[in-house]
């Protein structure tokens, strides 16, 4: 019992170093002010080209097959020939059973293979299954792993259970980047988003990510603001730079520019790099291309 209390106290002590008592209304007001004052200046071709290079080009459909994922990857292979003046996406994101297909099809340098894992999207399975799935994805070629926190554990106060799962999966990933999805729409409050951000970083996350895209609401500017504040404070206390990835519900170019603006204003120019900033999306690539080229493009 004493050991459990000390473990619980360890996580409470980590949270106590940060302000986790946030007002949702205050966050909404700050975000609205930031969008009004700062977003217009970032609506430039240069920013849009940069945002394209931050995309984790994603296909996470129940209808995905070896053939469809192969075609999806071939589009990335063809991109440089079709758009020689633009840089390619950051990564291709697929279910773990398709890692080998992407690895065997992908021919371009600099595009990573990201796989969702750990019982995505609900995270409701045995830790042994999560470990095995993650290890198999990496063995098949995944460079990056995207997992979901055990939301039920967090909401019931089992911080230890939530954090130990992340730590165990990071041990499996080793040098491969681990992106930890908070599923912010299920957390209901800015305070919970702040707490899960801190606990995830404390447990070994290389990135924190808003959403799976399988639950509504998905990414929101308010969630992004809280997460970026947490990343900034964590960096100030530890010297460790953690990446940020909004995902799900990024339906317009302006949505992407809003997330860019939040990162720029809260974290600074250092984070404006696709090693620390990603966008998880299936539709944004064509929208950005269309905006940059001034005509409708449906390349992907």
Where would I find each of the regions flagged by the language model?
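Metal-centered catalytic cores of metalloenzymes
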Residues: 286
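Charged, compositionally biased N-terminal leader segments and the immediate start
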Residues: 1-53
């Amino acid at each position: 019992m004493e050991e459990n209390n000390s473990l619980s106290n360890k996580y409470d002590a980590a949270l106590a170093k940060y302000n986790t008592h946030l007002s949702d209304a205050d966050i909404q007001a700050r975000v609205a002010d930031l969008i009004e004052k700062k977003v217009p200046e970032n609506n430039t071709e240069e920013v849009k080209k940069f945002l394209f290079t931050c995309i984790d080009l994603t296909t996470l459909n129940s209808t995905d097959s070896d053939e469809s994922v192969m075609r999806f990857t071939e589009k990335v292979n063809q991109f440089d020939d079709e758009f020689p003046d633009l840089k390619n996406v950051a990564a291709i994101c697929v279910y773990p059973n398709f890692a080998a297909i992407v690895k065997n099809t992908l021919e371009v340098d600099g595009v990573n293979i990201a796989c969702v894992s750990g019982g995505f999207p609900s995270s409701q399975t045995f830790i042994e299954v999560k470990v095995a799935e993650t290890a198999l994805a990496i063995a098949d070629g995944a460079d990056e792993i995207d997992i979901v926190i055990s939301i039920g554990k967090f909401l019931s106060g089992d911080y230890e259970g939530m954090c130990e799962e992340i730590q165990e999966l990071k041990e499996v990933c080793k040098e491969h980047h681990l992106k930890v999805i908070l599923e912010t729409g299920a957390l209901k409050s800015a305070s919970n988003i702040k707490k899960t951000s801190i606990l995830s970083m404390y447990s070994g996350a290389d990135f924190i990510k808003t959403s799976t895209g399988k639950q509504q609401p998905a990414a929101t500017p308010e969630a992004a603001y809280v997460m970026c504040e947490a990343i900034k404070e964590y960096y100030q206390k530890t010297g460790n730079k953690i990446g940020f990835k909004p995902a799900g519900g990024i339906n317009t170019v302006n949505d992407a520019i809003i997330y860019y603006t939040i990162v720029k204003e809260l974290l600074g120019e250092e984070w404006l790099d696709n090693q620390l900033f990603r966008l998880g999306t299936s539709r944004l690539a064509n929208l950005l291309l269309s905006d940059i080229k001034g005509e409708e493009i449906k390349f992907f």
